[in-house]
Amino acid sequence: MLRSRILVAVVGIPIGLAAIILGGYFILGLAVILTVLGMHEYYTLLRPYKPNLLVGYLAALAVVVGAYFLGLPGLLAGLAALVILSFFWSLFGELGAHLVGRMAVTHFGTLWVAAGFAYIILLRDLNHGMGLTILVLACTILNDTFAYFVGRA
Protein backbone atom coordinates (compact mmCIF):
# COMPACT_ATOMS: atom_id res chain seq x y z
CA MET A 1 0.00 0.00 0.00
CA LEU A 2 2.83 2.39 0.84
CA ARG A 3 4.52 1.64 -2.47
CA SER A 4 1.44 2.62 -4.46
CA ARG A 5 1.11 5.83 -2.43
CA ILE A 6 4.73 6.73 -3.13
CA LEU A 7 4.28 5.99 -6.83
CA VAL A 8 1.17 8.17 -7.01
CA ALA A 9 3.00 10.96 -5.17
CA VAL A 10 6.07 10.78 -7.41
CA VAL A 11 3.91 11.02 -10.54
CA GLY A 12 0.97 13.04 -9.23
CA ILE A 13 2.69 15.86 -7.37
CA PRO A 14 4.68 17.14 -10.38
CA ILE A 15 1.60 16.87 -12.62
CA GLY A 16 -0.52 18.70 -10.05
CA LEU A 17 2.08 21.42 -9.55
CA ALA A 18 2.48 21.87 -13.30
CA ALA A 19 -1.29 22.20 -13.77
CA ILE A 20 -1.52 24.71 -10.92
CA ILE A 21 1.39 26.78 -12.22
CA LEU A 22 0.24 26.72 -15.84
CA GLY A 23 -3.43 27.24 -14.94
CA GLY A 24 -5.97 27.62 -17.73
CA TYR A 25 -6.96 24.51 -19.60
CA PHE A 26 -4.25 22.51 -17.82
CA ILE A 27 -5.93 22.84 -14.44
CA LEU A 28 -9.34 22.29 -16.04
CA GLY A 29 -8.14 19.11 -17.73
CA LEU A 30 -6.61 17.76 -14.54
CA ALA A 31 -9.73 18.69 -12.55
CA VAL A 32 -11.97 16.89 -15.06
CA ILE A 33 -9.79 13.76 -15.03
CA LEU A 34 -9.60 13.68 -11.22
CA THR A 35 -13.33 14.35 -10.91
CA VAL A 36 -14.18 11.42 -13.18
CA LEU A 37 -11.74 9.16 -11.29
CA GLY A 38 -13.06 10.33 -7.92
CA MET A 39 -16.68 9.85 -8.96
CA HIS A 40 -15.84 6.37 -10.25
CA GLU A 41 -14.22 5.42 -6.95
CA TYR A 42 -17.11 6.89 -4.94
CA TYR A 43 -19.80 5.19 -7.00
CA THR A 44 -17.91 1.88 -6.98
CA LEU A 45 -17.85 1.93 -3.18
CA LEU A 46 -21.55 2.80 -3.02
CA ARG A 47 -22.74 0.51 -5.81
CA PRO A 48 -25.11 -1.39 -3.45
CA TYR A 49 -27.08 1.85 -2.95
CA LYS A 50 -27.63 2.17 -6.72
CA PRO A 51 -26.79 5.82 -7.40
CA ASN A 52 -27.76 7.19 -10.80
CA LEU A 53 -24.40 7.22 -12.57
CA LEU A 54 -25.53 9.22 -15.59
CA VAL A 55 -26.98 12.02 -13.46
CA GLY A 56 -23.97 12.02 -11.15
CA TYR A 57 -21.30 12.12 -13.86
CA LEU A 58 -23.13 14.73 -15.96
CA ALA A 59 -23.70 16.98 -12.96
CA ALA A 60 -20.12 16.55 -11.76
CA LEU A 61 -18.75 17.58 -15.13
CA ALA A 62 -21.20 20.51 -15.26
CA VAL A 63 -19.99 21.69 -11.84
CA VAL A 64 -16.28 21.57 -12.74
CA VAL A 65 -16.57 22.93 -16.28
CA GLY A 66 -19.12 25.53 -15.17
CA ALA A 67 -16.78 26.74 -12.43
CA TYR A 68 -13.96 27.11 -14.95
CA PHE A 69 -15.90 29.05 -17.56
CA LEU A 70 -18.40 30.98 -15.40
CA GLY A 71 -16.86 31.07 -11.92
CA LEU A 72 -19.05 30.57 -8.88
CA PRO A 73 -22.30 31.05 -10.86
CA GLY A 74 -21.18 28.18 -13.10
CA LEU A 75 -20.56 25.95 -10.11
CA LEU A 76 -24.01 26.79 -8.77
CA ALA A 77 -25.56 26.18 -12.21
CA GLY A 78 -23.96 22.73 -12.21
CA LEU A 79 -25.46 21.99 -8.81
CA ALA A 80 -28.84 23.23 -10.05
CA ALA A 81 -28.48 20.87 -13.02
CA LEU A 82 -27.91 18.05 -10.54
CA VAL A 83 -31.17 18.80 -8.76
CA ILE A 84 -33.12 19.20 -12.01
CA LEU A 85 -31.72 16.00 -13.53
CA SER A 86 -32.54 14.16 -10.30
CA PHE A 87 -36.13 15.34 -10.37
CA PHE A 88 -36.49 14.18 -13.99
CA TRP A 89 -34.95 10.88 -12.94
CA SER A 90 -37.52 10.54 -10.17
CA LEU A 91 -40.41 11.50 -12.47
CA PHE A 92 -39.56 9.52 -15.59
CA GLY A 93 -36.88 7.03 -14.59
CA GLU A 94 -36.85 4.00 -12.42
CA LEU A 95 -38.98 4.39 -9.36
CA GLY A 96 -38.66 1.47 -7.01
CA ALA A 97 -37.69 1.42 -3.39
CA HIS A 98 -35.25 3.79 -1.77
CA LEU A 99 -35.43 6.44 -4.50
CA VAL A 100 -34.71 9.27 -2.06
CA GLY A 101 -31.71 7.39 -0.66
CA ARG A 102 -30.41 6.74 -4.16
CA MET A 103 -30.80 10.43 -4.99
CA ALA A 104 -28.96 11.37 -1.79
CA VAL A 105 -26.03 9.09 -2.64
CA THR A 106 -25.92 10.56 -6.15
CA HIS A 107 -26.05 14.16 -4.87
CA PHE A 108 -23.46 13.68 -2.16
CA GLY A 109 -20.92 12.28 -4.62
CA THR A 110 -21.25 15.35 -6.80
CA LEU A 111 -20.96 17.69 -3.83
CA TRP A 112 -18.04 15.87 -2.26
CA VAL A 113 -15.92 15.15 -5.32
CA ALA A 114 -16.82 17.65 -8.04
CA ALA A 115 -17.38 20.70 -5.85
CA GLY A 116 -13.95 20.17 -4.28
CA PHE A 117 -12.20 20.26 -7.63
CA ALA A 118 -14.37 23.17 -8.77
CA TYR A 119 -13.26 25.14 -5.73
CA ILE A 120 -9.62 24.42 -6.61
CA ILE A 121 -10.30 25.99 -10.01
CA LEU A 122 -11.96 29.00 -8.36
CA LEU A 123 -9.14 29.34 -5.84
CA ARG A 124 -6.53 29.32 -8.62
CA ASP A 125 -8.26 32.29 -10.26
CA LEU A 126 -7.99 34.53 -7.17
CA ASN A 127 -5.23 37.09 -6.58
CA HIS A 128 -2.27 35.05 -5.32
CA GLY A 129 -4.34 32.01 -6.30
CA MET A 130 -1.40 29.97 -7.52
CA GLY A 131 0.31 30.17 -4.12
CA LEU A 132 -2.93 29.50 -2.26
CA THR A 133 -3.70 26.49 -4.43
CA ILE A 134 -0.20 25.08 -3.90
CA LEU A 135 -0.68 25.60 -0.14
CA VAL A 136 -3.96 23.67 -0.26
CA LEU A 137 -2.26 20.87 -2.22
CA ALA A 138 0.62 20.74 0.29
CA CYS A 139 -1.76 20.66 3.27
CA THR A 140 -3.80 17.90 1.67
CA ILE A 141 -0.70 15.80 0.97
CA LEU A 142 0.64 16.31 4.51
CA ASN A 143 -2.76 15.53 6.05
CA ASP A 144 -3.09 12.34 4.02
CA THR A 145 0.48 11.29 4.84
CA PHE A 146 0.11 11.84 8.58
CA ALA A 147 -3.30 10.12 8.63
CA TYR A 148 -1.81 7.11 6.87
CA PHE A 149 1.08 6.74 9.32
CA VAL A 150 -0.92 7.54 12.46
CA GLY A 151 -3.60 5.09 11.36
CA ARG A 152 -1.00 2.36 10.98
CA ALA A 153 0.58 3.01 14.41
Placement of each model-derived feature along the sequence:
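Membrane-embedded alpha-helical bundles of polytopic integral membrane proteins
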Residues: 2-153
